Amino acid sequence: MSATNPTRDDFAALLEESFAKTDLAEGYVAKGIVTAIEKDVAIVDVGLKVEGRVPLKEFGAKAKDGTLKVGDEVEVYVERIENALGEAVLSREKARREESWQRLEVKFEAGERVEGIIFNQVKGGFTVDLDGAVAFLPRSQVDIRPIRDVTPLMHNPQPFEILKMDKRRGNIVVSRRTVLEESRAEQRSEIVQNLEEGQVVEGVVKNITDYGAFVDLGGIDGLLHVTDMAWRRVNHPSEILNIGQQVKVQIIRINQETHRISLGMKQLESDPWDGIGAKYPVGKKISGTVTNITDYGAFVELEPGIEGLIHISEMSWTKKNVHPGKILSTSQEVDVVVLEVDPTKRRISLGLKQTLENPWQAFAHSHPAGTEVEGEVKNKTEFGLFIGLDGDVDGMVHLSDLDWNRPGEQVIEEFNKGDVVRAVVLDVDVDKERISLGIKQLGRDAVGEAAASGELRKNAVVSAEVIGVNDGGIEVRLVNHEDVTAFIRRADLSRDRDEQRPERFSVGQTVDARVTNFSKKDRKIQLSIKALEIAEEKEAVAQFGSSDSGASLGDILGAALKNRQNNE
Protein backbone atom coordinates (compact mmCIF):
# COMPACT_ATOMS: atom_id res chain seq x y z
CA MET A 1 0.00 0.00 0.00
CA SER A 2 1.40 3.34 -1.01
CA ALA A 3 1.55 5.93 1.76
CA THR A 4 1.29 8.75 -0.74
CA ASN A 5 -1.54 7.53 -2.98
CA PRO A 6 -3.75 4.91 -1.30
CA THR A 7 -6.18 2.95 -3.49
CA ARG A 8 -9.79 2.06 -2.73
CA ASP A 9 -8.70 -1.49 -2.05
CA ASP A 10 -6.27 -0.19 0.55
CA PHE A 11 -9.10 1.71 2.32
CA ALA A 12 -11.23 -1.42 2.31
CA ALA A 13 -8.44 -3.45 3.86
CA LEU A 14 -7.86 -0.87 6.56
CA LEU A 15 -11.54 -0.66 7.39
CA GLU A 16 -11.88 -4.40 7.62
CA GLU A 17 -8.89 -4.52 9.95
CA SER A 18 -10.21 -1.61 12.05
CA PHE A 19 -13.77 -2.82 12.45
CA ALA A 20 -13.23 -6.55 12.56
CA LYS A 21 -13.17 -6.39 16.34
CA THR A 22 -15.89 -3.73 16.69
CA ASP A 23 -19.57 -4.25 17.20
CA LEU A 24 -20.89 -0.78 16.41
CA ALA A 25 -23.93 0.74 18.02
CA GLU A 26 -25.15 4.25 18.75
CA GLY A 27 -23.70 6.13 21.72
CA TYR A 28 -20.17 4.72 21.61
CA VAL A 29 -16.72 5.77 20.48
CA ALA A 30 -15.53 4.01 17.30
CA LYS A 31 -12.40 4.08 15.15
CA GLY A 32 -12.77 5.35 11.59
CA ILE A 33 -10.74 6.27 8.50
CA VAL A 34 -10.68 9.72 6.94
CA THR A 35 -11.72 9.00 3.36
CA ALA A 36 -11.86 12.59 2.15
CA ILE A 37 -11.37 16.17 3.28
CA GLU A 38 -13.66 18.78 1.89
CA LYS A 39 -13.90 22.52 2.57
CA ASP A 40 -14.70 22.43 6.30
CA VAL A 41 -15.49 18.79 6.99
CA ALA A 42 -13.76 15.46 7.02
CA ILE A 43 -15.52 12.41 5.58
CA VAL A 44 -15.07 9.48 7.99
CA ASP A 45 -15.94 5.85 7.36
CA VAL A 46 -16.52 3.77 10.51
CA GLY A 47 -17.67 0.62 8.64
CA LEU A 48 -21.32 1.49 8.46
CA LYS A 49 -23.43 1.42 5.34
CA VAL A 50 -22.90 5.14 5.06
CA GLU A 51 -20.10 7.54 5.91
CA GLY A 52 -20.30 10.46 8.30
CA ARG A 53 -19.27 14.09 8.09
CA VAL A 54 -17.23 15.61 10.96
CA PRO A 55 -16.50 19.39 11.14
CA LEU A 56 -12.77 20.03 10.79
CA LYS A 57 -12.78 22.40 13.79
CA GLU A 58 -13.47 19.40 16.02
CA PHE A 59 -10.05 18.02 15.12
CA GLY A 60 -8.40 21.06 16.74
CA ALA A 61 -4.73 21.71 15.93
CA LYS A 62 -4.51 18.96 13.30
CA ALA A 63 -7.12 20.72 11.20
CA LYS A 64 -5.52 24.13 11.66
CA ASP A 65 -2.00 23.15 10.70
CA GLY A 66 -3.11 20.79 7.91
CA THR A 67 -1.68 17.63 9.41
CA LEU A 68 -5.00 15.80 9.16
CA LYS A 69 -4.73 13.65 6.01
CA VAL A 70 -6.89 11.24 4.04
CA GLY A 71 -6.24 7.74 5.35
CA ASP A 72 -5.65 8.86 8.98
CA GLU A 73 -7.26 6.73 11.63
CA VAL A 74 -9.41 8.77 14.05
CA GLU A 75 -11.76 8.11 16.93
CA VAL A 76 -15.27 9.54 16.67
CA TYR A 77 -18.48 9.27 18.65
CA VAL A 78 -21.36 7.54 16.85
CA GLU A 79 -24.45 9.55 17.70
CA ARG A 80 -26.72 8.03 15.03
CA ILE A 81 -26.10 5.26 12.54
CA GLU A 82 -28.01 7.12 9.84
CA ASN A 83 -29.90 10.41 9.71
CA ALA A 84 -32.55 11.71 7.34
CA LEU A 85 -29.84 12.64 4.80
CA GLY A 86 -28.58 9.09 4.72
CA GLU A 87 -25.38 9.97 6.59
CA ALA A 88 -23.91 8.69 9.84
CA VAL A 89 -23.92 11.34 12.59
CA LEU A 90 -20.37 11.38 14.00
CA SER A 91 -18.57 13.69 16.46
CA ARG A 92 -14.88 13.99 17.17
CA GLU A 93 -15.62 16.43 20.03
CA LYS A 94 -17.87 13.98 21.81
CA ALA A 95 -15.33 11.25 21.33
CA ARG A 96 -12.74 13.40 23.04
CA ARG A 97 -15.20 14.03 25.88
CA GLU A 98 -15.90 10.34 26.22
CA GLU A 99 -12.19 9.66 26.39
CA SER A 100 -11.84 12.38 29.02
CA TRP A 101 -14.73 10.96 31.07
CA GLN A 102 -13.16 7.53 31.12
CA ARG A 103 -9.79 8.96 32.08
CA LEU A 104 -11.33 11.23 34.74
CA GLU A 105 -13.35 8.40 36.26
CA VAL A 106 -10.17 6.43 36.80
CA LYS A 107 -8.52 9.41 38.53
CA PHE A 108 -11.67 10.15 40.54
CA GLU A 109 -11.77 6.59 41.87
CA ALA A 110 -8.06 6.77 42.69
CA GLY A 111 -8.41 10.19 44.37
CA GLU A 112 -5.87 11.75 42.01
CA ARG A 113 -5.76 15.39 41.04
CA VAL A 114 -6.55 16.50 37.49
CA GLU A 115 -5.40 19.45 35.44
CA GLY A 116 -7.86 21.91 33.98
CA ILE A 117 -8.39 25.45 32.72
CA ILE A 118 -11.01 27.91 34.02
CA PHE A 119 -12.50 29.36 30.83
CA ASN A 120 -15.91 30.86 31.65
CA GLN A 121 -18.02 32.31 34.45
CA VAL A 122 -21.54 30.99 35.09
CA LYS A 123 -24.18 31.38 37.79
CA GLY A 124 -22.74 30.30 41.13
CA GLY A 125 -19.24 29.61 39.84
CA PHE A 126 -17.10 28.83 36.79
CA THR A 127 -16.63 26.23 34.03
CA VAL A 128 -13.39 24.28 33.77
CA ASP A 129 -12.03 22.43 30.72
CA LEU A 130 -10.62 19.07 31.82
CA ASP A 131 -9.06 18.17 28.46
CA GLY A 132 -12.35 17.81 26.67
CA ALA A 133 -14.76 17.34 29.58
CA VAL A 134 -16.42 20.42 31.07
CA ALA A 135 -16.64 20.63 34.87
CA PHE A 136 -18.33 23.05 37.27
CA LEU A 137 -16.23 24.95 39.82
CA PRO A 138 -18.43 26.47 42.60
CA ARG A 139 -17.38 29.95 43.68
CA SER A 140 -16.83 28.70 47.24
CA GLN A 141 -14.29 26.17 45.94
CA VAL A 142 -12.08 28.63 44.03
CA ASP A 143 -9.80 29.55 46.95
CA ILE A 144 -9.36 29.20 50.70
CA ARG A 145 -10.55 32.77 51.15
CA PRO A 146 -13.17 34.58 49.04
CA ILE A 147 -11.70 36.12 45.86
CA ARG A 148 -13.39 39.08 44.22
CA ASP A 149 -11.45 39.03 40.93
CA VAL A 150 -10.85 35.58 39.39
CA THR A 151 -9.47 36.97 36.12
CA PRO A 152 -5.80 36.16 36.96
CA LEU A 153 -6.78 32.50 37.44
CA MET A 154 -8.59 32.07 34.12
CA HIS A 155 -7.07 30.41 31.03
CA ASN A 156 -4.16 29.02 33.02
CA PRO A 157 -3.65 25.27 33.63
CA GLN A 158 -4.17 24.47 37.32
CA PRO A 159 -4.63 21.36 39.47
CA PHE A 160 -8.13 20.48 40.68
CA GLU A 161 -9.74 17.76 42.75
CA ILE A 162 -12.90 16.05 41.50
CA LEU A 163 -15.61 16.23 44.15
CA LYS A 164 -18.45 14.59 42.22
CA MET A 165 -19.11 12.86 38.87
CA ASP A 166 -22.53 12.01 37.39
CA LYS A 167 -22.11 10.53 33.91
CA ARG A 168 -25.84 10.10 33.33
CA ARG A 169 -26.40 13.81 33.79
CA GLY A 170 -23.00 14.77 32.44
CA ASN A 171 -22.05 16.64 35.64
CA ILE A 172 -18.57 17.03 37.09
CA VAL A 173 -17.88 19.20 40.16
CA VAL A 174 -14.29 20.16 40.94
CA SER A 175 -12.48 22.11 43.65
CA ARG A 176 -9.35 24.20 43.59
CA ARG A 177 -9.74 25.03 47.28
CA THR A 178 -9.14 21.47 48.52
CA VAL A 179 -5.91 21.32 46.52
CA LEU A 180 -4.74 24.58 48.10
CA GLU A 181 -5.75 23.42 51.58
CA GLU A 182 -3.86 20.16 51.21
CA SER A 183 -0.80 21.97 49.93
CA ARG A 184 -1.10 24.53 52.67
CA ALA A 185 -1.51 21.84 55.33
CA GLU A 186 1.63 20.11 54.10
CA GLN A 187 3.48 23.40 54.09
CA ARG A 188 2.16 24.35 57.55
CA SER A 189 3.11 20.96 58.95
CA GLU A 190 6.65 21.34 57.66
CA ILE A 191 6.94 24.87 59.09
CA VAL A 192 5.46 23.89 62.45
CA GLN A 193 8.03 21.11 62.79
CA ASN A 194 10.74 23.76 62.72
CA LEU A 195 9.13 25.97 65.39
CA GLU A 196 9.40 25.63 69.17
CA GLU A 197 7.55 27.16 72.10
CA GLY A 198 9.57 30.02 73.55
CA GLN A 199 11.26 30.71 70.21
CA VAL A 200 11.52 34.36 69.14
CA VAL A 201 10.63 34.94 65.49
CA GLU A 202 9.82 37.81 63.16
CA GLY A 203 6.64 38.15 61.16
CA VAL A 204 4.38 40.55 59.32
CA VAL A 205 0.98 41.70 60.59
CA LYS A 206 -1.47 40.20 58.09
CA ASN A 207 -4.85 41.05 59.62
CA ILE A 208 -6.24 42.92 62.65
CA THR A 209 -9.43 42.02 64.52
CA ASP A 210 -11.09 43.23 67.71
CA TYR A 211 -9.49 40.42 69.70
CA GLY A 212 -6.00 40.38 68.22
CA ALA A 213 -3.80 40.29 65.13
CA PHE A 214 -2.75 37.53 62.73
CA VAL A 215 0.96 37.49 62.01
CA ASP A 216 2.45 35.76 58.94
CA LEU A 217 5.48 33.75 60.04
CA GLY A 218 6.42 32.83 56.49
CA GLY A 219 3.78 30.44 55.23
CA ILE A 220 1.83 29.99 58.43
CA ASP A 221 -0.16 32.45 60.55
CA GLY A 222 -0.01 32.88 64.30
CA LEU A 223 -2.50 34.70 66.54
CA LEU A 224 -1.23 37.54 68.66
CA HIS A 225 -4.06 38.04 71.17
CA VAL A 226 -4.73 41.56 72.38
CA THR A 227 -3.94 40.52 75.97
CA ASP A 228 -0.46 39.38 74.90
CA MET A 229 0.49 42.56 73.05
CA ALA A 230 1.60 44.58 76.07
CA TRP A 231 1.60 44.39 79.86
CA ARG A 232 -0.58 47.50 79.91
CA ARG A 233 -4.24 47.58 78.87
CA VAL A 234 -4.75 47.60 75.09
CA ASN A 235 -8.34 48.45 74.17
CA HIS A 236 -7.86 47.59 70.49
CA PRO A 237 -4.92 46.06 68.58
CA SER A 238 -4.91 48.99 66.15
CA GLU A 239 -3.58 51.16 69.00
CA ILE A 240 -0.11 49.61 68.60
CA LEU A 241 -0.15 47.62 65.34
CA ASN A 242 -0.72 48.27 61.63
CA ILE A 243 -1.32 45.84 58.76
CA GLY A 244 2.00 45.17 57.01
CA GLN A 245 4.04 46.06 60.09
CA GLN A 246 7.01 43.81 60.83
CA VAL A 247 7.05 42.62 64.44
CA LYS A 248 9.18 40.45 66.69
CA VAL A 249 7.14 37.94 68.70
CA GLN A 250 7.61 34.94 70.96
CA ILE A 251 5.89 31.63 70.31
CA ILE A 252 3.78 30.91 73.41
CA ARG A 253 1.93 27.76 72.38
CA ILE A 254 1.86 25.37 69.42
CA ASN A 255 -1.00 22.94 68.82
CA GLN A 256 0.56 20.17 66.76
CA GLU A 257 -2.84 18.75 65.78
CA THR A 258 -4.53 21.94 64.59
CA HIS A 259 -1.28 23.79 63.75
CA ARG A 260 -2.56 26.80 65.68
CA ILE A 261 0.16 29.06 67.01
CA SER A 262 -0.26 31.57 69.85
CA LEU A 263 2.13 34.51 69.87
CA GLY A 264 3.13 37.16 72.39
CA MET A 265 4.89 40.51 72.33
CA LYS A 266 4.77 41.43 76.01
CA GLN A 267 6.67 38.24 76.85
CA LEU A 268 9.75 39.84 75.30
CA GLU A 269 9.76 42.42 78.12
CA SER A 270 10.22 41.96 81.88
CA ASP A 271 7.03 41.32 83.87
CA PRO A 272 6.12 44.49 85.81
CA TRP A 273 4.20 42.33 88.33
CA ASP A 274 7.41 40.83 89.69
CA GLY A 275 7.87 42.16 93.25
CA ILE A 276 4.59 44.07 93.04
CA GLY A 277 3.73 43.51 96.74
CA ALA A 278 6.82 45.33 97.98
CA LYS A 279 6.35 48.14 95.49
CA TYR A 280 2.71 48.77 96.36
CA PRO A 281 2.14 47.85 100.02
CA VAL A 282 -1.38 47.95 101.46
CA GLY A 283 -2.23 51.42 102.75
CA LYS A 284 0.14 53.27 100.42
CA LYS A 285 -1.24 56.41 98.79
CA ILE A 286 -0.32 56.67 95.09
CA SER A 287 -1.35 58.50 91.92
CA GLY A 288 -2.61 57.01 88.67
CA THR A 289 -4.58 57.59 85.49
CA VAL A 290 -8.12 56.36 84.87
CA THR A 291 -7.99 54.10 81.79
CA ASN A 292 -11.45 52.52 81.73
CA ILE A 293 -14.81 52.96 83.45
CA THR A 294 -17.35 50.16 83.86
CA ASP A 295 -20.64 49.69 85.69
CA TYR A 296 -18.82 48.14 88.63
CA GLY A 297 -15.87 50.51 88.97
CA ALA A 298 -12.91 52.20 87.30
CA PHE A 299 -9.48 50.90 86.25
CA VAL A 300 -6.46 53.04 87.11
CA GLU A 301 -3.02 52.65 85.52
CA LEU A 302 -0.32 52.99 88.17
CA GLU A 303 2.52 52.41 85.69
CA PRO A 304 2.81 50.80 82.23
CA GLY A 305 1.46 47.27 82.58
CA ILE A 306 0.09 47.73 86.11
CA GLU A 307 -3.58 48.54 86.64
CA GLY A 308 -5.76 48.50 89.73
CA LEU A 309 -9.52 48.53 90.17
CA ILE A 310 -11.47 51.05 92.21
CA HIS A 311 -14.66 49.16 92.98
CA ILE A 312 -17.81 51.26 93.00
CA SER A 313 -18.15 50.64 96.75
CA GLU A 314 -14.73 52.26 97.32
CA MET A 315 -15.38 55.47 95.37
CA SER A 316 -17.37 57.61 97.79
CA TRP A 317 -18.28 57.50 101.45
CA THR A 318 -21.79 58.77 100.82
CA LYS A 319 -22.69 58.30 97.11
CA LYS A 320 -23.71 54.65 97.13
CA ASN A 321 -25.84 54.23 94.02
CA VAL A 322 -24.05 56.51 91.55
CA HIS A 323 -22.46 55.23 88.32
CA PRO A 324 -18.63 55.48 88.41
CA GLY A 325 -18.81 57.71 85.33
CA LYS A 326 -20.53 60.37 87.46
CA ILE A 327 -17.53 60.48 89.80
CA LEU A 328 -14.54 59.86 87.49
CA SER A 329 -13.68 60.26 83.82
CA THR A 330 -11.14 58.50 81.58
CA SER A 331 -7.63 60.04 81.47
CA GLN A 332 -8.28 61.73 84.82
CA GLU A 333 -5.36 61.80 87.26
CA VAL A 334 -6.45 60.53 90.69
CA ASP A 335 -4.98 59.78 94.10
CA VAL A 336 -5.83 56.34 95.45
CA VAL A 337 -4.96 54.08 98.38
CA VAL A 338 -3.83 50.45 97.95
CA LEU A 339 -6.38 48.19 99.67
CA GLU A 340 -5.24 44.73 98.52
CA VAL A 341 -2.60 43.17 96.24
CA ASP A 342 -2.93 39.68 94.73
CA PRO A 343 0.19 38.92 92.62
CA THR A 344 -1.12 35.47 91.62
CA LYS A 345 -4.33 36.81 90.10
CA ARG A 346 -2.59 40.04 89.05
CA ARG A 347 -5.13 42.18 90.84
CA ILE A 348 -4.77 45.36 92.85
CA SER A 349 -7.75 46.74 94.74
CA LEU A 350 -7.71 50.51 95.13
CA GLY A 351 -9.75 52.96 97.16
CA LEU A 352 -10.67 56.50 96.22
CA LYS A 353 -12.76 57.40 99.27
CA GLN A 354 -9.88 56.43 101.56
CA THR A 355 -7.99 59.52 100.38
CA LEU A 356 -10.74 61.66 101.92
CA GLU A 357 -11.88 62.11 105.52
CA ASN A 358 -14.38 59.50 106.66
CA PRO A 359 -17.56 61.55 107.29
CA TRP A 360 -18.87 58.91 109.71
CA GLN A 361 -15.70 59.12 111.75
CA ALA A 362 -15.79 62.90 111.64
CA PHE A 363 -19.42 62.92 112.78
CA ALA A 364 -18.69 60.50 115.63
CA HIS A 365 -15.84 62.74 116.78
CA SER A 366 -17.91 65.94 116.75
CA HIS A 367 -21.23 64.41 117.85
CA PRO A 368 -20.81 61.99 120.76
CA ALA A 369 -23.82 60.11 122.12
CA GLY A 370 -26.27 62.51 123.77
CA THR A 371 -25.59 65.38 121.35
CA GLU A 372 -28.67 67.11 119.99
CA VAL A 373 -28.78 67.55 116.19
CA GLU A 374 -31.14 69.03 113.62
CA GLY A 375 -31.85 67.78 110.14
CA GLU A 376 -34.36 67.31 107.35
CA VAL A 377 -36.50 64.20 106.98
CA LYS A 378 -35.13 62.62 103.77
CA ASN A 379 -37.16 59.44 103.79
CA LYS A 380 -39.93 57.72 105.75
CA THR A 381 -39.97 53.91 105.84
CA GLU A 382 -41.88 51.18 107.63
CA PHE A 383 -39.19 50.99 110.30
CA GLY A 384 -38.38 54.65 110.91
CA LEU A 385 -37.21 58.04 109.66
CA PHE A 386 -33.98 58.92 107.85
CA ILE A 387 -32.63 62.35 108.78
CA GLY A 388 -30.04 64.24 106.71
CA LEU A 389 -27.17 65.49 108.88
CA ASP A 390 -24.01 67.58 108.54
CA GLY A 391 -21.24 66.01 106.47
CA ASP A 392 -23.66 64.55 103.90
CA VAL A 393 -24.49 61.60 106.16
CA ASP A 394 -27.86 60.24 107.26
CA GLY A 395 -29.09 59.14 110.65
CA MET A 396 -32.06 56.91 111.42
CA VAL A 397 -34.76 57.31 114.04
CA HIS A 398 -36.28 53.90 114.70
CA LEU A 399 -40.02 53.61 115.34
CA SER A 400 -39.29 52.70 118.93
CA ASP A 401 -37.41 55.98 119.44
CA LEU A 402 -40.15 58.34 118.25
CA ASP A 403 -42.24 58.59 121.45
CA TRP A 404 -42.05 57.30 125.01
CA ASN A 405 -45.67 56.32 125.34
CA ARG A 406 -47.38 56.10 121.93
CA PRO A 407 -46.76 53.38 119.29
CA GLY A 408 -44.15 54.34 116.70
CA GLU A 409 -46.45 53.24 113.84
CA GLN A 410 -48.89 55.92 115.00
CA VAL A 411 -46.36 58.67 115.69
CA ILE A 412 -44.50 58.35 112.36
CA GLU A 413 -47.63 59.47 110.51
CA GLU A 414 -47.11 62.95 112.04
CA PHE A 415 -43.86 63.39 110.07
CA ASN A 416 -43.46 64.25 106.37
CA LYS A 417 -40.54 64.26 103.96
CA GLY A 418 -38.83 67.65 104.15
CA ASP A 419 -39.75 68.35 107.78
CA VAL A 420 -36.92 69.76 109.87
CA VAL A 421 -36.68 67.89 113.16
CA ARG A 422 -34.46 67.75 116.23
CA ALA A 423 -33.10 64.52 117.64
CA VAL A 424 -30.53 63.10 120.03
CA VAL A 425 -27.51 61.05 118.89
CA LEU A 426 -27.83 57.59 120.46
CA ASP A 427 -24.95 55.75 118.76
CA VAL A 428 -22.50 56.03 115.85
CA ASP A 429 -21.12 52.84 114.25
CA VAL A 430 -18.27 54.02 112.03
CA ASP A 431 -17.52 50.58 110.53
CA LYS A 432 -21.15 49.94 109.54
CA GLU A 433 -21.68 53.62 108.65
CA ARG A 434 -24.77 53.91 110.84
CA ILE A 435 -25.99 56.74 113.02
CA SER A 436 -28.82 55.98 115.46
CA LEU A 437 -30.98 58.92 116.52
CA GLY A 438 -33.86 59.36 118.92
CA ILE A 439 -36.62 61.95 119.07
CA LYS A 440 -38.32 60.77 122.25
CA GLN A 441 -35.02 61.24 124.10
CA LEU A 442 -35.52 64.99 123.78
CA GLY A 443 -38.19 64.69 126.55
CA ARG A 444 -38.40 63.05 130.01
CA ASP A 445 -39.10 59.35 130.29
CA ALA A 446 -41.62 59.63 133.11
CA VAL A 447 -42.60 55.98 132.99
CA GLY A 448 -38.94 54.96 133.00
CA GLU A 449 -38.23 57.14 136.00
CA ALA A 450 -41.20 55.66 137.86
CA ALA A 451 -40.05 52.16 137.01
CA ALA A 452 -36.51 52.99 138.14
CA SER A 453 -37.84 54.22 141.51
CA GLY A 454 -39.44 50.83 142.10
CA GLU A 455 -43.01 52.11 142.26
CA LEU A 456 -44.07 50.06 139.27
CA ARG A 457 -42.78 46.72 140.49
CA LYS A 458 -45.46 44.03 140.67
CA ASN A 459 -47.68 44.15 143.82
CA ALA A 460 -46.38 47.62 144.75
CA VAL A 461 -49.04 49.95 146.21
CA VAL A 462 -49.30 53.42 144.65
CA SER A 463 -51.42 56.48 145.30
CA ALA A 464 -53.12 58.03 142.30
CA GLU A 465 -55.37 60.97 141.55
CA VAL A 466 -58.52 60.43 139.50
CA ILE A 467 -58.33 62.53 136.32
CA GLY A 468 -61.15 60.96 134.34
CA VAL A 469 -64.26 58.78 134.79
CA ASN A 470 -66.13 56.72 132.16
CA ASP A 471 -68.28 53.60 131.95
CA GLY A 472 -65.25 51.35 131.54
CA GLY A 473 -63.39 52.57 134.62
CA ILE A 474 -61.32 55.49 135.81
CA GLU A 475 -58.16 57.17 134.51
CA VAL A 476 -55.63 58.08 137.16
CA ARG A 477 -52.30 59.90 137.52
CA LEU A 478 -49.62 58.73 139.95
CA VAL A 479 -49.22 61.14 142.83
CA ASN A 480 -45.42 60.76 142.98
CA HIS A 481 -45.01 60.83 139.17
CA GLU A 482 -47.52 63.25 137.70
CA ASP A 483 -46.56 62.52 134.07
CA VAL A 484 -47.40 58.83 134.47
CA THR A 485 -51.00 57.81 133.86
CA ALA A 486 -52.85 54.51 134.07
CA PHE A 487 -56.37 53.15 133.67
CA ILE A 488 -58.24 51.11 136.29
CA ARG A 489 -60.92 48.92 134.74
CA ARG A 490 -64.44 48.69 136.21
CA ALA A 491 -63.79 45.09 137.35
CA ASP A 492 -60.77 46.30 139.35
CA LEU A 493 -62.53 49.16 141.16
CA SER A 494 -63.61 47.01 144.16
CA ARG A 495 -63.75 43.43 145.43
CA ASP A 496 -67.41 44.11 146.15
CA ARG A 497 -69.36 43.79 142.87
CA ASP A 498 -71.88 46.43 143.98
CA GLU A 499 -69.05 48.90 144.50
CA GLN A 500 -67.59 48.46 141.00
CA ARG A 501 -69.35 51.62 139.85
CA PRO A 502 -67.09 54.24 138.21
CA GLU A 503 -69.58 56.99 139.03
CA ARG A 504 -68.83 56.67 142.74
CA PHE A 505 -65.40 58.18 141.99
CA SER A 506 -64.87 61.88 141.29
CA VAL A 507 -62.12 63.81 139.51
CA GLY A 508 -59.47 64.95 141.99
CA GLN A 509 -60.14 62.08 144.39
CA THR A 510 -57.08 60.17 145.59
CA VAL A 511 -57.18 56.36 145.55
CA ASP A 512 -54.75 53.61 146.46
CA ALA A 513 -54.24 50.69 144.08
CA ARG A 514 -51.96 47.73 143.63
CA VAL A 515 -49.65 47.29 140.58
CA THR A 516 -50.72 44.00 138.98
CA ASN A 517 -48.55 44.26 135.85
CA PHE A 518 -46.05 46.52 134.09
CA SER A 519 -44.71 45.88 130.55
CA LYS A 520 -41.44 47.58 129.71
CA LYS A 521 -41.93 46.78 126.03
CA ASP A 522 -45.29 48.49 125.46
CA ARG A 523 -45.02 50.58 128.67
CA LYS A 524 -48.49 49.65 129.92
CA ILE A 525 -49.31 49.86 133.65
CA GLN A 526 -52.14 47.81 135.18
CA LEU A 527 -53.55 48.97 138.56
CA SER A 528 -56.26 47.34 140.68
CA ILE A 529 -58.11 48.60 143.80
CA LYS A 530 -59.74 45.18 144.02
CA ALA A 531 -56.37 43.45 144.25
CA LEU A 532 -55.29 45.82 147.00
CA GLU A 533 -58.45 45.14 149.02
CA ILE A 534 -58.04 41.38 148.69
CA ALA A 535 -54.40 41.63 149.75
CA GLU A 536 -55.25 43.79 152.76
CA GLU A 537 -58.01 41.39 153.78
CA LYS A 538 -55.65 38.43 153.68
CA GLU A 539 -53.08 40.39 155.65
CA ALA A 540 -55.67 41.36 158.31
CA VAL A 541 -56.84 37.81 158.73
CA ALA A 542 -53.28 36.68 159.14
CA GLN A 543 -52.50 39.42 161.67
CA PHE A 544 -55.63 39.82 163.81
CA GLY A 545 -57.48 36.54 163.56
CA SER A 546 -57.01 32.80 163.66
CA SER A 547 -59.11 29.73 163.04
CA ASP A 548 -59.92 29.24 166.74
CA SER A 549 -60.16 32.83 167.97
CA GLY A 550 -63.92 33.02 167.57
CA ALA A 551 -63.62 36.59 166.15
CA SER A 552 -65.91 37.51 163.29
CA LEU A 553 -64.65 38.83 159.93
CA GLY A 554 -66.12 42.22 160.83
CA ASP A 555 -64.16 42.32 164.08
CA ILE A 556 -60.96 41.40 162.25
CA LEU A 557 -61.40 44.04 159.55
CA GLY A 558 -62.34 46.63 162.14
CA ALA A 559 -59.18 45.95 164.07
CA ALA A 560 -57.12 46.10 160.89
CA LEU A 561 -58.70 49.42 159.90
CA LYS A 562 -58.04 50.89 163.33
CA ASN A 563 -54.41 49.72 163.18
CA ARG A 564 -53.99 51.24 159.73
CA GLN A 565 -55.42 54.59 160.91
CA ASN A 566 -53.06 54.61 163.87
CA ASN A 567 -50.10 53.95 161.56
CA GLU A 568 -51.15 56.76 159.31
UniProtKB/Swiss-Prot annotation:
Family classification: Belongs to the bacterial ribosomal protein bS1 family.
Gene Ontology molecular function, alphabetical: mRNA binding; structural constituent of ribosome
Domain of life of the organism encoding this protein: Bacteria
Lineage: Bacteria, Pseudomonadati, Pseudomonadota, Alphaproteobacteria, Hyphomicrobiales
PANTHER family from the UniProt entry: 30S RIBOSOMAL PROTEIN S1, SMALL RIBOSOMAL SUBUNIT PROTEIN BS1C
Listed SUPFAM superfamilies: Nucleic acid-binding proteins (SSF50249)
Domain S1 motif: 27-93, 111-177, 198-266, 283-353, 370-440, 459-530
Species name: Rhizobium meliloti (strain 1021) (Ensifer meliloti)
Cited function: Binds mRNA; thus facilitating recognition of the initiation point. It is needed to translate mRNA with a short Shine-Dalgarno (SD) purine-rich sequence.
Protein name (database record): Small ribosomal subunit protein bS1
One Pfam family recorded for the sequence: S1
GO biological process terms held by the UniProt record: translation
Keyword list, A-Z: Repeat, Ribonucleoprotein, Ribosomal protein, RNA-binding
CC annotations in GO: cytosolic small ribosomal subunit
